[in-house]
Structures are given as structure tokens and as C-alpha cells.
Amino acid sequence: KVAVNPDPRSLWKDIPTDKNIKFFKEDYSHEYITVVENEKGPQKDIVAASKRGRSHAHEGKARDDDFNIYHNDSNGWYIIAVADGAGSAKYSRKGSAVACETCVEFCKTALENPIELEKEIIALNSTTEGQSNRAISTLIYNIVGGAAHKAHRAILETASANEDQPRDYSTTLLLAICKKFDFGWFVASFWVGDGAMCIYDKERQYIKLLGTPDGGEYAGQT
């Protein structure tokens, strides 16, 4: 007997999301921000993309993930937010969008006048390893932690306005702010959920994980 197995890719459907659903979102989104060289030398561009997963496409479900990216051309600060909406939550596609947008807007405002923060970052660079710097810890927490708290409040308000439960908008969140200084890059991050962020140096083949992914009682729980 001869058995012929079909190409697995041909078994998967790509059903467009119904545009009439609540909180419709395009099945694919991407953005590229070009950051020009300045007095500190070459900078890093920002690229982000979000594509509906294969299982969602097969069933015609909406893309749950989202992102929001920003670069302040006047002071050099980068802001990056990525959210992976929990698939078990019916409006996670909205929760992820609300979380990303709220965090970036909060950080944009917080970093409009970063003189005190940058002063502490420069001071941190001159301290010996292991020496604590409570001042910068507080400043960073107020920015990235404050952004996450604001995002949580925004999701609660969205749920209330639509007479839904907050859990219907469940989402993970990855947030980072960074800037290039004369001595190198400063990166601060905050995350909620089972995602992960890292710094990758291609030349040195170096990877630095910026935290520990959250885990639930079972695999895939957020």
C-alpha cells in the first residue's frame, strides 16, 4: 500500500476575522521607526510586528496580541510595549491594545523631562558593582510600575464602560524604556505574565534575560 500525506500547510485555513465583531482588530500589524544618528553616534531603529496565530486563523478568530512603540527624537528615549492577550479571555484583543497604548502614553509623559532620571543613571554608572541606588530604583518604579498600574486601571474602566468583567480583557504585558548614553545603553523593564524580554548582542553572542516569566498552575496559564 502507498500512503500519501498532504502538505500540513494545506490543512490550515486562513479565515479572515469578521469585521463586525466587537473590538475588531486587523489580522496583521507592523511598524518601523527609523531613528537617525545623533551626537552620541548611531542609534537603534525600532521594529514591531503582530500576526494572528495559526490556530486563530484556522478558526477565524481575532488577533489577541498588540504592541505600541515610540521614540522621543528630542531626548533619545525609547518606549516599547508588547502584550499577548490571554486566549481564554473573550476581549483580550482589546485588553492588550489598552495595556500597550496606556503604558506608552504614560511613559511618554513621564519621560518628557528626564533630567533627574538621567542624572541618577549617570551616577549609577559610576558606582561600584553591588552598591545600591535607591533613588534610581524609585524613579524607575514610578515610571514603568506606574505605567502598568495605569494600564490596569484603564482595563477596569474599559470593562466597566462596556458592562463586562475585567477578566474578559486579560492580557500579559512587556514594557521597556531605554536610552543610549556615552557609556552604553540603559534599559529598564517591567512585565506581567508568561512573556519574556532579553537583550541580545550579536557580536559578543550575549543574551541577557531581563526578568523571570510568570507561571501558573498549568502550562500556558497567564
What are these regions (language model features)?
Residues K1-T222:
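PP2C/PPM-type serine/threonine phosphatase catalytic domain
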